[in-house]
Amino acid sequence: MRTGKQYLESLNDGRVVWVGNEKIDNVATHPLTRDYAERVAQFYDLHHRPDLQDVLTFVDADGVRRSRQWQDPKDAAGLRVKRKYHETILREIAAGSYGRLPDAHNYTFTTYADDPEVWEKQSIGAEGRNLTQNIHNFLKLLREKDLNCPLNFVDPQTDRSSDAAQARSPNLRIVEKTDDGIIVNGVKAVGTGIAFGDYMHIGCLYRPGIPGEQVIFAAIPTNTPGVTVFCRESTVKNDPAEHPLASQGDELDSTTVFDNVFIPWEQVFHIGNPEHAKLYPQRIFDWVHYHILIRQVLRAELIVGLAILITEHIGTSKLPTVSARVAKLVAFHLAMQAHLIASEETGFHTKGGRYKPNPLIYDFGRAHFLQNQMSVMYELLDLAGRSSLMIPSEGQWDDSQSGQWFVKLNNGPKGNPRERVQIGRVIRDLYLTDWGGRQFMFENFNGTPLFAVFAATMTRDDMSAAGTYGKFASQVCGIEFGGAEPTAYAATADYAKALDKGLAPEPAAAESATS
């Protein structure tokens, strides 16, 4: 298994990365990037800790010990083992503050692995090349070398006023095909952690009007000639004492420019078919979304814990009004946990033999978090009061004259004054810093914004009058409604529906998605 040292050494490979106004010479050592690089290194090193060996690693069929990120769950019990793996990683690294560690990034490839053949059969313009084998080969490479392959799917936010605008946009597109590969030119507008990846996973999110040359699913090394990664300004803080979370690094969102970049056919998974891409805005990220829900449950748990700590330290925890408000936070956490458990218990087996959690339940669980994150943030900040804002600096606290006043200002019925400052600093990092503000924005748009979560999830079951909900209501009303005509969901390609409910496609299910 890869070590953190090996990972850090691999980053000094000539990749072209900007962070704000600075061009980064070495991602592993530059002050704007080194802290998060250390967090990814920590991810790898956790797998070598003897006390975590049984939780984070397994021995595969060939007798090789590997990270559990590569273990495929075969039943609900196996899925719970994977959940424990992800939870442990998240708890150990900045309390679940980073949504794009390697185990999350690499999860997208599970969707390919569940049914790789259709990515080749649905391609247009690949001239019979064995793209299915490309998928198998790249999955093997990821697993054998423990690589980190961030997602680079989001296209520029340019003219959204008409479908025709897609063709005029600077979206990444194929500009030439050769016997050896494709040449692409253009932009991917938002990717998280791209600067820290070994490879980047290129894909697209379908929009009406997208031309076939913009439909590209592939993987390339981050240091590929012609690739430049432009990261936003870093929000990392330099003082671990003052900023216990924000000092641990910024995973950095970025825009990637591809200037006539060559991609060998061996690294291409699918090209050319908007109708195929139309089926995957959510499905390609299914396992990532499950990981998101695990992290959101952990974040909800942290919010409850911080509320309990600060109200006990202040001395307000026994007040009925305060207790009732903390109870709301507990209810939020338990509701999130219920979505997670229910998705696991109502899962199904995919064509590839994996036991997959129920997408409708975990996606609506993600929506529940987004609907409530503003209100739970407000509750925590209000319960904390000035304790999350009026925090003495280390210099003020240690000063021989002023320090005594800050001890008195932070004294309470439980704990010591210094502990209240520590609690306040964590709350401040989460919600009252630019680092925390970026976290909030990431949650809003990570795995699609709220309206898109609802819209996309509603296309993954028959929500028409002929569907389960409609049939029951029709029965109660004593009517027959909507049963004759085929529904939109029924017309969806079987191979896509198999990712929603575990349907077993017939041999002909890999026919064109347009037929």
From Swiss-Prot:
GO molecular-function terms, A-Z: oxidoreductase activity, acting on paired donors, with incorporation or reduction of molecular oxygen, reduced flavin or flavoprotein as one donor, and incorporation of one atom of oxygen; oxidoreductase activity, acting on the CH-CH group of donors
Q: Which UniProt keywords apply?
A: Aromatic hydrocarbons catabolism, FAD, Flavoprotein, Monooxygenase, Oxidoreductase
Q: Which domain of life is it from?
A: Bacteria
- Pathway the protein takes part in: Xenobiotic degradation
Query: What Gene Ontology biological process does one annotation of this record name?
Result: catabolic process
EC code: 1.14.14.-
One Pfam family for this entry, by name?
A: HpaB
UniProt: substrate binding residues: 100-104, 203-204
Residues that coordinate or bind FAD: 151-153, 157-160, 192, 457-460
InterPro entries, per the entry: Acyl-CoA_Oxase/DH_mid-dom_sf (IPR046373), AcylCo_DH-like_C (IPR036250), AcylCoA_DH/oxidase_NM_dom_sf (IPR009100), HpaB/PvcC/4-BUDH (IPR004925), HpaB/PvcC/4-BUDH_C (IPR024719), HpaB/PvcC/4-BUDH_N (IPR024674)
EC supergroup of this enzyme: oxidoreductase
Q: Does the keyword Oxidoreductase apply?
A: yes
Matching entries from Gene3D superfamilies are given as: 4-hydroxybutyryl-coa dehydratase, domain 1, Butyryl-CoA Dehydrogenase, subunit A, domain 2, Butyryl-CoA Dehydrogenase, subunit A, domain 3
Function recorded in the entry: Oxygenase component of a two-component system that degrades 2,4,5-trichlorophenol. Uses FADH(2) supplied by TftC to oxidize 2,4,5-trichlorophenol (2,4,5-TCP) to 2,5-dichloro-p-benzoquinone, which is chemically reduced to 2,5-dichloro-p-hydroquinone (2,5-DiCHQ). Then, TftD oxidizes the latter to 5-chloro-2-hydroxy-p-benzoquinone.
Q: Record's family?
A: Belongs to the FADH(2)-utilizing monooxygenase family.
Assembly and oligomerization? Homotetramer. The chlorophenol-4-monooxygenase is composed of an oxygenase component TftD and a reductase component TftC.
Q: What is this protein called?
A: FADH(2)-dependent monooxygenase TftD
**Organism name:** Burkholderia cepacia
Q: Which gene encodes it?
A: tftD
